């Protein structure tokens, strides 16, 4: 089925070639902000990495407690919890030292507490929970969760995650290189790098401002974003290639503009329907899936932008065959 215009006086929904400098400015600014986020995160003494690593990668012990409250839970502060740790008589003196740098976070309107510290033994974790209960009040039956990951296992998981990301992106690069010519492949890979970089940059800033951490779920989100981005880009490339073969009256810039206009509605509809369940996860998916859904939603938006704006705008630099 041909989608080429019957005449050359076609009105483009979005004229990429005319607005390409604006597209480059927007993407360039987003990439610059992302690199700044990496820099400030790396130089931050409390982080020391481009992204704030989560419990999965750093190891340690994570304790989640749910308080028993009739309606609203009374407000307590991290100072109250720290004082409880200082006043507690732990059987092991090293426990107090481990809790000195513990991260304390309140969830669900002070109904739940999250404590993250260097690795604790089961007996130490039990004593920590008892000391918190003295300040926070009674806890829900079964509302206690204790997880421990050794630093060696955490480092191994981080290494495995990075390798899996590298392998996945390499496979995508090979697929694109086989499917399209060299120039198309280069721009598609650039778009993939652009999408992943910006999502990571946003989470870098979130780690600095809001102490948001990245974990293994974030790596899954990046892999999903890569696949989604490539799929959208391939659709636009296929339309450009089809028009390039069938329409000889148009120059290459016109072909790119028409291909973008022809796929714009499809891309927006696909992105919109993909965002709907992600929005539901953001509001109703709980704390575990919250940032995972945020990362995916951001990736869908950025991926759509690169597919219908950034890559086609770069293709307009290509000379006529």
From Swiss-Prot:
InterPro entries: SecD/SecF_arch_bac, SecD/SecF_bac, SecD_SecF_C, SecF_bac
Membrane topology: Multi-pass membrane protein
Gene Ontology terms: biological process: intracellular protein transmembrane transport; protein targeting; protein transport by the Sec complex
Gene Ontology cellular-component terms listed: plasma membrane
Cell inner membrane keyword on record: yes
GO molecular function: protein-transporting ATPase activity
Coiled coil spans: none
NCBIfam families linked: transloc_SecF (TIGR00966)
Membrane-spanning ranges: 23-43, 158-178, 189-209, 217-237, 258-280, 290-312
Protein location: Cell inner membrane
Organism: Prochlorococcus marinus (strain SARG / CCMP1375 / SS120)
Name of the protein described by the UniProt record: Protein translocase subunit SecF
Main location group: membrane
Assembly behavior: Forms a complex with SecD. Part of the essential Sec protein translocation apparatus which comprises SecA, SecYEG and auxiliary proteins SecDF. Other proteins may also be involved.
Keyword Nuclease: no
UniProt record similarity statement: Belongs to the SecD/SecF family. SecF subfamily.
Keywords: Cell inner membrane, Cell membrane, Membrane, Protein transport, Translocation, Transmembrane, Transmembrane helix, Transport
Role played: Part of the Sec protein translocase complex. Interacts with the SecYEG preprotein conducting channel. SecDF uses the proton motive force (PMF) to complete protein translocation after the ATP-dependent function of SecA. Probably participates in protein translocation into and across both the cytoplasmic and thylakoid membranes in cyanobacterial cells.
